[in-house]
């Protein structure tokens, strides 16, 4: 009977250890995915900022010429 108890405890312990390792790996994968999503969001924000700056520059140069053409 004692042998069965020890075997059962050993099986349960090994199962808990393996479950713990799997949970840890799952959390690491989720963290990596979140970091990738954050990096992609930052890249998109950077692209939008650059795009808006470019549009603003074009508008600054084109708008005065367009207004002076209309006044003539």
UniProtKB/Swiss-Prot annotation:
Localization terms from the record: Secreted
Top-level division of the source organism's lineage: Eukaryota
Annotated propeptide span(s): 23-43
Major subcellular site: secreted
Annotated Acidic residues bias: 30-41
Signal peptide (residue range): 1-22
GO biological process: defense response to bacterium
Annotated segments matching region Disordered: 24-45
Alphabetic keyword roster: Amphibian defense peptide, Antibiotic, Antimicrobial, Cleavage on pair of basic residues, Secreted, Signal
Tissue note: Expressed by the skin glands.
Family: Belongs to the frog skin active peptide (FSAP) family.
Name of the protein in its database record: Dermaseptin AA-3-4
Species of the source: Agalychnis annae
